[in-house]
């Protein structure tokens, strides 16, 4: 079960990013430092009380300007709202209501997503109430005064947010497996879709950029339904025309987020390019299960060692995806194409898998016995109290510790490797949230979101 999404909306310079940092704290997903893998963070995990969710900062929203990149931001905001359970509209309490705020409010009132109005930069409780009252006329309900920098007032706002977030048991498991077929232009995605479905639904052409929209096809095998989503090829930004193709790429990114499993298609003749690495980082950031589909295998001269040599070369570049299945296929001849769905079944099952708290703590106990947590220069040692799985799709495990800052990146990677070694989660990324002991102690700061 994936975490519900909360979209953070607002014009530029009202403190949206500061607010997102307040909610997410140190919980940003750990990524590798290989050049080209990471990109600017948009989706970040957050939690309040007993509820986990994701927040997405959509960028500064402006409606009366069509200069470069502003249309993208508006499109990103639309896409975020389409998948969000709720939206938080952030305004500047010190500046007061502006014409841009009113335009955004009018747009939000036309959406079906519930909206919570956050009046930021209210540093004084008494003055904040006065500042917030000026925003009643926007027609979005009660304005909540708060300070993203200091955290005051965020508790009341987040309590209101929880009313719109579904409890985990309210979201039923879906029988259908959603599979996004993604990759650079002209690596054979549409040919692969046609081979899997047996139909010429997508336009197959050697001209890069032929597929502009996300195309859904439903196939059934052995009683299991698969929704296959072909997408526009992901290319470097400098090569993108900010027209139909740009929005096609945005839809491709959205397809990744709505998928259970991503078929990451690579051209064996090209190997792993820099753009492939960036796309791989995007897939991991969105927490999708992955099958690495190496296409055009029919074009390679082979002997008994060729497949092992290519696997080694590819994984040297995609080492951060060493948990994903890699399958060599030919969409043109059909070689091993049907075996792809076997890999999808395994990845989807692992992506949805839930492990008991007892098993998680057995793994932690053994890991700590082999390698104790690090000690700071001041002689203070990290301590892991316990761990528990908080969500699936992807599997996310919260580790409650005395101080997250006492656990360096090396030790965090060690713990993740132990979970991989003992629990598998083959084909799926996993996320570890390191939470301080004080996170659940709300008595001292009931109206303040706590960074950890």
UniProtKB/Swiss-Prot annotation:
Keywords: GTP-binding, Nucleotide-binding, Repeat, Ribosome biogenesis
EngA-type G domain sequence ranges: 4-169, 177-352
Residues the entry annotates as binding GTP 1: 10-17, 57-61, 120-123
Annotated binding of GTP 2, by residue: 183-190, 230-234, 295-298
Signal peptide positions on this chain: none
Domain KH-like per the UniProt entry, residue ranges: 353-439
Quaternary structure note: Associates with the 50S ribosomal subunit.
NCBIfam families: GTPase_EngA, small_GTP
Family recorded in the similarity comment: Belongs to the TRAFAC class TrmE-Era-EngA-EngB-Septin-like GTPase superfamily. EngA (Der) GTPase family.
Protein purpose: GTPase that plays an essential role in the late steps of ribosome biogenesis.
Protein name: GTPase Der
Source organism: Synechocystis sp. (strain ATCC 27184 / PCC 6803 / Kazusa)
Source taxonomy: Bacteria, Bacillati, Cyanobacteriota, Cyanophyceae, Synechococcales
């Amino acid at each position: 079960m994936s975490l519900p999404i909360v979209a953070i909306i607002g014009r530029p310079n009202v403190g949206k990013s500061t607010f997102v940092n307040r909610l997410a704290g140190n919980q940003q997903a750990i990524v590798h430092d290989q050049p080209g893998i990471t990109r600017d963070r948009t989706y970040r995990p957050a939690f309040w009380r007993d509820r986990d969710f994701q927040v997405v900062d959509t960028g500064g929203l402006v409606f009366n300007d069509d200069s470069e990149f502003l249309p993208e931001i508006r499109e990103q905001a639309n896409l975020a709202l389409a998948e969000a359970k709720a939206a938080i509209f952030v305004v500047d309490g010190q500046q007061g209501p502006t014409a841009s705020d009113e335009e955004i409010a009018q747009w939000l009132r036309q959406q079906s997503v519930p909206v919570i109005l956050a009046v930021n930069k209210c540093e004084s409780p008494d003055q904040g109430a006065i500042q917030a009252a000026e925003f009643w006329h926007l027609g979005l309900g009660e304005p909540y005064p708060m300070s993203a920098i200091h955290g005051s007032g965020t508790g009341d706002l987040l309590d209101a947010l929880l009313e719109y977030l579904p409890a985990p048991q309210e979201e039923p498991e879906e029988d259908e497996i959603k599979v996004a077929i993604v990759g650079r232009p002209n690596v054979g995605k549409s040919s692969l879709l046609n081979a899997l479905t047996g139909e010429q639904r997508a336009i197959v052409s050697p001209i890069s950029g032929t597929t502009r929209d996300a195309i859904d096809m439903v196939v059934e095998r052995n009683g299991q339904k698969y929704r296959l989503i072909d997408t526009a090829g992901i290319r470097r930004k400098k090569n993108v025309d900010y027209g139909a193709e740009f929005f096609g790429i945005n839809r491709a990114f959205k397809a990744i987020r709505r998928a259970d499993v991503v078929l990451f298609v690579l051209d064996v003749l090209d190997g792993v390019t820099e753009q492939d690495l960036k796309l791989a980082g995007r897939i991991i950031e969105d927490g999708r299960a992955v099958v690495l589909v190496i296409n055009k295998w029919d074009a390679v001269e082979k002997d008994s060692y060729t497949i092992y040599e290519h696997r080694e070369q590819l994984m040297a570049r995609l080492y951060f995806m060493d948990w994903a299945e890699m399958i060599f296929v030919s969409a043109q001849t059909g070689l091993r194409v049907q075996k792809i769905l076997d890999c999808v079944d395994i990845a989807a099952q692992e992506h949805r898998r839930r492990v008991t708290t007892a098993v998680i703590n057995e793994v932690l106990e053994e890991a700590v016995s082999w390698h104790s947590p690090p000690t700071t220069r001041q002689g203070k040692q990290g301590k892991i109290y316990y761990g528990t799985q908080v969500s699936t799709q992807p599997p996310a495990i919260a580790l409650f510790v005395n101080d997250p800052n006492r656990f360096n990146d090396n030790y965090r990677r060690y713990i993740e490797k132990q979970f991989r070694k003992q629990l598998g989660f083959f084909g799926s990324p996993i996320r570890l949230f390191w939470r301080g002991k004080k996170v659940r102690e709300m008595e001292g700061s009931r109206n303040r979101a706590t960074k950890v």
